[in-house]
Amino acid sequence: MAERRIPLKHEYAQDGKVIYGVDEAGRGPLAGPVYAACVVLDPADVIEGLADSKQLSEKKRISLADQIKQRARAWAIASASVEEIDRLNILQASLLAMQRAVVSLRPISNALVLVDGNHAPRLDCEVQTVIRGDSLVAEISAASILAKTARDIEMLRLHEAYPVYGFDRHKGYPTKAHLEAIRLHGITDIHRRSFAPCVGQSVSGARTTSFINQKEA
């Protein structure tokens, strides 16, 4: 299958606007932070193969993430913690992560921030939401790839701390294996206690000694 670049919608490319694409990763999992990314692509340096991160293999996502970081005009990745998710709710925490990613790039005066979905963070610049933006707008697609790969790396790191939960396989999503691990071991301090399967569960001490020593070093 031929690779393709997702074309910008015509109206978004007008008026000399600089497009900042924004997307998040990790709203559905029971554990771990939620991530967001913001990307400004170079129109003169087309990155082939961009698509919704969920439609790409892990190998392809990693390859594209490296290209985006090397060839984009600007990019940023941010997150909101499990504590923020439980305190604010997952939607507001996702918007907070998006806001952090965009603000860290200090958008210029003619910036147009395009956000995947139908909710946008509060920003001091022009913002539009785009339903299915990760499949329609190259900048949003690139942001979805950076957010997803960054979160996956974090969940692999957390797997070292809590290997019995299998975060290396499901990345915190509510798979059958993950739910069974919660039933057997309880939850950890990186589980989202406001999410239904985790509500009322006891906190486990199932953390590896090597990870504790690493954190304390």
Curated annotation (Swiss-Prot):
Broad enzyme group: hydrolase
Alphabetical list of InterPro entries matching this protein: RNase_HII (IPR022898), RNase_HII/HIII (IPR001352), RNase_HII/HIII_dom (IPR024567), RNaseH-like_sf (IPR012337), RNaseH_sf (IPR036397)
Main location: cytoplasm
Keywords tagged on the record: Cytoplasm, Endonuclease, Hydrolase, Manganese, Metal-binding, Nuclease
Obligatory cofactor(s): Mn(2+); Mg(2+)
Superkingdom of this protein's organism: Bacteria
Swiss-Prot/TrEMBL catalytic activity: Endonucleolytic cleavage to 5'-phosphomonoester
EC identifiers of the protein: 3.1.26.4
One GO biological process term: mismatch repair
Cellular component annotations (GO), alphabetically ordered: cytoplasm; ribonuclease H2 complex
Domain RNase H type-2 per the UniProt entry, residue ranges: 17-207
A GO molecular-function descriptor: RNA binding
CDD domains with a match to the protein in the record: RNase_HII_bacteria_HII_like (cd07182)
Keyword Cytoplasm: yes
Subcellular location: Cytoplasm
Cofactor detail note: Manganese or magnesium. Binds 1 divalent metal ion per monomer in the absence of substrate. May bind a second metal ion after substrate binding.
Residues that hold a divalent metal cation according to the record: 23-24, 116
Keyword Metal-binding assigned: yes
Coiled coil start-end: none
UniProt xrefs under NCBIfam families: PRK00015.1-3, PRK00015.1-4
Assigned protein family: Belongs to the RNase HII family.
Function text: Endonuclease that specifically degrades the RNA of RNA-DNA hybrids.
Record-linked PANTHER family: RIBONUCLEASE H2 SUBUNIT A (PTHR10954), RIBONUCLEASE HII (PTHR10954:SF18)
Protein's UniProt name: Ribonuclease HII
Lineage of producing organism: Bacteria, Pseudomonadati, Pseudomonadota, Betaproteobacteria, Nitrosomonadales
Gene expressing this chain: rnhB
